[in-house]
């Protein structure tokens, strides 16, 4: 089995080394194609106005000056040639990718692009706690990832479906279990725009999230609830985002 690994945190990110270690427990034919620079939050963007620069940094390890989507395309269509990968793994992301994160995430996008190209694809993310100074416990993803992947691969992943796996912010032995979840909904009141001034007094801005305690109880069955309870969250995501229920309403309204 040929595995293509990518991420959005960049070619030198610790999580990329973890996903490669996970991949090597599944196969010895592992290729890494990742962004040269941090591409967090770029979503499914594709470089159309700038050329892509490809740099081989080691055997089967390549850096692309582009987005995670660019990396998967370069890996599947150029570096690996006609055969392409049998599996795409994107991650392991530093921080969870749940709820609305999936819209912004370059990690999710890497897996989505793999699925679009016809390959079974997984996004993997490691939640971290500020109690641990924001350092993820990578060993949790490494300990639990391979077995979860094997079971899902043996089951088979439907076409046009991506598997989003999030590991909780706890030690491997403290993981309660695995839950199949749906995408949750977060309180976006935490989103903020931080205005600052440069040396000339001109304004510039950062978009971020308030580091405050979460008071909302996540809905049962969601990715948010699973992580809060110490479970690994496994969420199947579909490429087809059509709202079939509201489509029926619109048919009545517009018919």
From Swiss-Prot:
Keyword Nucleotide-binding among record annotations: yes
Compartmental location: Cytoplasm
Chief localisation class: cytoplasm
A Pfam short name: SurE
Sequence positions that bind a divalent metal cation: 8-9, 40, 93
Signal peptide: none
GO cellular component, one term: cytoplasm
Cytoplasm found in the keyword field: yes
Annotated keywords: Cytoplasm, Hydrolase, Metal-binding, Nucleotide-binding
EC number from the UniProt entry: 3.1.3.5
Cofactor binding summary note: Binds 1 divalent metal cation per subunit.
SUPFAM superfamilies the UniProt entry points to: SurE-like
Disulphide-bridged cysteine pairs: none
Cofactor: a divalent metal cation
One MF annotation (Gene Ontology) recorded for this entry: metal ion binding
Group of enzyme by EC: hydrolase
Family classification: Belongs to the SurE nucleotidase family.
Role noted for this protein: Nucleotidase that shows phosphatase activity on nucleoside 5'-monophosphates.
Record's protein name: 5'-nucleotidase SurE
Native species: Rhodopseudomonas palustris (strain BisB18)
């Amino acid at each position: 089995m040929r595995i293509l690994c990518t991420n959005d945190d960049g070619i030198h990110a610790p999580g990329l080394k973890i996903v490669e270690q996970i991949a090597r427990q599944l196969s010895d034919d592992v290729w890494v194609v990742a962004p040269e620079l941090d591409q967090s939050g770029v979503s499914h963007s594709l470089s159309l106005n700038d050329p892509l620069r490809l740099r081989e940094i080691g055997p089967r390890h390549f850096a692309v000056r582009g987005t995670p989507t660019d990396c998967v395309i370069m890996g599947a269509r150029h570096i690996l040639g006609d055969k392409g990968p049998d599996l795409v793994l994107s991650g392991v992301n530093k921080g969870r990718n749940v709820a609305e994160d999936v819209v912004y995430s370059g990690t999710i996008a890497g897996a989505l692009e793999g699925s679009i190209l016809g390959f079974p694809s997984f996004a993997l993310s490691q939640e971290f706690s500020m109690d641990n100074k924001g350092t993820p416990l990578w060993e949790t993803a490494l300990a639990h990832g391979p077995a979860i992947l094997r079971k899902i691969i043996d089951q088979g992943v439907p076409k046009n479906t991506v598997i989003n796996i999030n590991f909780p912010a706890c030690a491997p032995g403290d993981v309660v279990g695995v839950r199949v979840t749906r995408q949750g909904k977060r309180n976006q009141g935490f989103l903020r725009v931080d205005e600052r001034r440069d040396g000339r007094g001109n304004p510039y801005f950062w978009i971020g999230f308030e580091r405050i305690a979460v008071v909302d109880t996540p809905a049962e069955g969601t990715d948010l609830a699973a992580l809060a309870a110490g479970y690994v969250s496994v969420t199947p995501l579909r490429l087809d985002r059509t709202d079939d229920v509201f489509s029926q309403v619109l048919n009545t309204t517009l018919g």
